Swiss-Prot record:
The gene is infA. The lineage of its organism: Bacteria, Pseudomonadati, Pseudomonadota, Gammaproteobacteria, Alteromonadales. Pfam families: eIF-1a (PF01176). This is Translation initiation factor IF-1. Component of the 30S ribosomal translation pre-initiation complex which assembles on the 30S ribosome in the order IF-2 and IF-3, IF-1 and N-formylmethionyl-tRNA(fMet); mRNA recruitment can occur at any time during PIC assembly. CDD domains: S1_IF1. It is found in: Cytoplasm. Residues 1-72 form the S1-like domain. Coiled coil: none annotated. It comes from Colwellia psychrerythraea (strain 34H / ATCC BAA-681). One of the essential components for the initiation of protein synthesis. Stabilizes the binding of IF-2 and IF-3 on the 30S subunit to which N-formylmethionyl-tRNA(fMet) subsequently binds. Helps modulate mRNA selection, yielding the 30S pre-initiation complex (PIC). Upon addition of the 50S ribosomal subunit IF-1, IF-2 and IF-3 are released leaving the mature 70S translation initiation complex. Belongs to the IF-1 family. The keyword RNA-binding applies.
Length: 72
């Protein structure tokens, strides 16, 4: 089975939720719930409210995503 292409979008962290979950507003205005990717968790990358992040969304559920990059 072929791997589905994920959608990458830029966004801003609005709120911090429990269990390393975040509420992120995307550039197009949609608000999604996102968690930190494994490599960011392993390297102790801190994400705070207001940070610019790159979120990876799957085509199956566009309301949830994974934070894969935090802009400086």
């Amino acid at each position: 089975m072929a791997k589905e292409e994920n959608i990458e979008m830029q966004g801003t962290v609005l709120d911090t939720l429990p269990n390393t979950m975040f509420r992120v507003e995307l550039e197009n205005g949609h608000v999604v719930t996102a968690h930190i990717s494994g490599k960011m968790r392993k390297n102790y990358i801190r994400i705070l409210t207001g940070d610019k992040v790159t979120v990876e969304l799957t085509p199956y559920d566009l309301s949830k995503g994974r934070i894969i990059f935090r802009a400086r």
